[in-house]
């Protein structure tokens, strides 16, 4: 198995980190809204595209996508994001690269996802989070199996 979690990708300078988990605190989301979340998501998927290119270049065949690709995604629908067309384009492109170069992409839900919780709100949040993960893989046009 080949794993891919290098500290820095490509030849970008230190002041331009390549990362897929740009996020924000709740107060920032409340004040700046979905527009800012959309901007951060677009930057995250652009950098995911860069990471996949880097992985292909160096022969890495596995990458785990962060759960924070779309900050505060539980608070809005994908279709409400101003940058959704570009986000979908990048995700589709990433899916094509992953299939073409046999890069396995996975994700891992957060530690608070407990489908068996006795608390209805915990289960609801878990289902929402898992749905968001599925939406990302759907936008990449990857199969509904654990073998992407």
Where are these regions (language model features)?
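Short, intrinsically disordered, charge-balanced linker/junction segments flanking boundaries
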Residues: 143-148
